[in-house]
Swiss-Prot record:
Family affiliation: Belongs to the glutaminase family.
GO MF terms, alphabetically ordered: glutaminase activity
Subunit structure: Homotetramer.
Name assigned to this protein: Glutaminase
Reactions it catalyzes: L-glutamine + H2O = L-glutamate + NH4(+)
Enzyme class, broadest EC rank: hydrolase
Keyword Oxidoreductase attributed: no
Recorded name of the encoding gene: glsA
Keywords: Hydrolase
Enzyme Commission code: 3.5.1.2
Amino acid sequence: MLDANKLQQAVDQAYTQFHSLNGGQNADYIPFLANVPGQLAVVAIVTCDGNVYSAGDSDYRFALESISKVCTLALALEDVGPQAVQDKIGADPTGLPFNSVIALELHGGKPLSPLVNAGAIATTSLINAENIEQRWQRILHIQQQLAGEQVALSDEVNQSEQTTNFHNRAIAWLLYSAGYLYCDAMEACDVYTRQCSTLINTVELATLGATLAAGGLNPLTHKRVLQADNVPYILAEMMMEGLYGRSGDWAYRVGLPGKSGVGGGILAVVPGVMGIAAFSPPLDEEGNSVRGQKMVASVAKQLGYNVFKG
């Protein structure tokens, strides 16, 4: 049994130490994100037995952004299986910025990773669907199953992104021209943009992590969301590419599968134990929450969790 007092103390200490840390700036290329109050900071744990611990304004809802890639990857694995995902998308870190097209040019149009923009758009196109709305509803539903029923599309975020996503549209057409997109290019880009535009809070984000930690069983709803055999593939991708250019550094220092988003959210998974999540809008140059990284790493270190420790 996990010690409840110890878990709450770890969360409280991480929050106290880092919630006012200076550094970084909000993503400014998406108007909605540029206007989120920069002083916000939250950290939370959800355990595999369904207990919740948090510090900060855990009710504040923020844009899921790139963390949505984890959910869509999970659905693709359920739909087509791990071999098809590896063959059609890839399972390798790019070593490049999350929105780069260089890897596409170097590898014949194959995106390599489902956790960078090119691979994520391709993954969205892999989802079994007869039309754009079915594709979108299935992705929204998996987000809700993994994290909580309150996860919903923000029209304000979506509008802000749909009017500025020219680079992703270009990526979609590059994928299409190379034969690595599996539906209409603008359908894939539209749905991908929507999946990034849902709102979530930090406890729900930690619940997503706890669901992965529990092998696909949501510890709060007690419903199986994913086949247990598919979860290791998700965690492997998170370890390799979850924090973009910081992924290697994160694996070296923290040693947990993680995923960040430019909305300021960050997630880590302790397999078999818990999900740890944080939110704070100012980002480093790679697009990861400055305070969020520190808070999640602090919780993991205090509790002694690192998958490489054995």
